[in-house]
């Protein structure tokens, strides 16, 4: 069984080593969505997991369906940068299988890109989200 924690850690590690992404967002600002540090530096990326579902309804299932949201935050007057970074993330990972940290991402399917919008908790920033559905197994 693959855990959500393993999948999230694999995504974070992979994003941190993807030059097209880290050219716009410092690797130290790529973290799990639940991170509760005291400093929130922009731009940043947070990795949020959705459902982890077995592809076969039995205890011997080796492939799972995983939902992941890559959330891009910026603090600027315009939403343009958030949308640009979201596009870079989508391009870097859509249909590009990878292995990281003991997890093999057999298929990485882009399900949507949410255009930048102002999050309800911070009127000075923008949030754009890239949503993927993946097939994963142990590497």
Give the positions of each predicted feature.
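Small/polar-rich, solvent-exposed N-terminal microdomains that initiate assembly or binding
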Residues: 1-60, 80, 96-106
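Acidic-leaning, charged glycine-interspersed low-complexity segments
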Residues: 23, 91-139
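A broad, low-specificity signal marking well-ordered, structured residues that form hydrophobic/aromatic
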Residues: 43-45, 68, 108, 130
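Short, low-complexity, polar/charged sequence segments that are solvent-exposed and flexible
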Residues: 49-52, 64-69, 89-92
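Extracellular/virion structural assembly segments
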Residues: 61, 75-94
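Oligomerization/assembly interface segments of phage tail-like spikes and tubes
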Residues: 61-77, 125-137
């Amino acid at each position: 069984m693959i855990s959500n924690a393993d999948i999230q850690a694999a995504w974070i590690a992979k994003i941190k080593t993807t030059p097209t992404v880290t050219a716009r967002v410092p690797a130290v600002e790529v973290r799990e969505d639940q991170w509760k540090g005291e400093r929130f530096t922009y731009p940043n990326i947070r990795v949020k997991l959705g459902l982890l579902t077995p592809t076969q309804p039995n205890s011997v299932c080796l492939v799972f369906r995983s939902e992941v949201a890559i959330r891009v935050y910026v603090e600027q007057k315009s939403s343009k940068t958030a949308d640009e970074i979201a596009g870079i993330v989508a391009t870097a990972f859509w249909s590009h299988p990878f292995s990281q940290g003991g997890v093999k991402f057999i298929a990485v399917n882009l399900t949507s890109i949410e255009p930048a919008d102002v999050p309800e908790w911070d009127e000075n920033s923008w949030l754009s989200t890239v949503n993927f559905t993946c097939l994963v197994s142990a590497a």
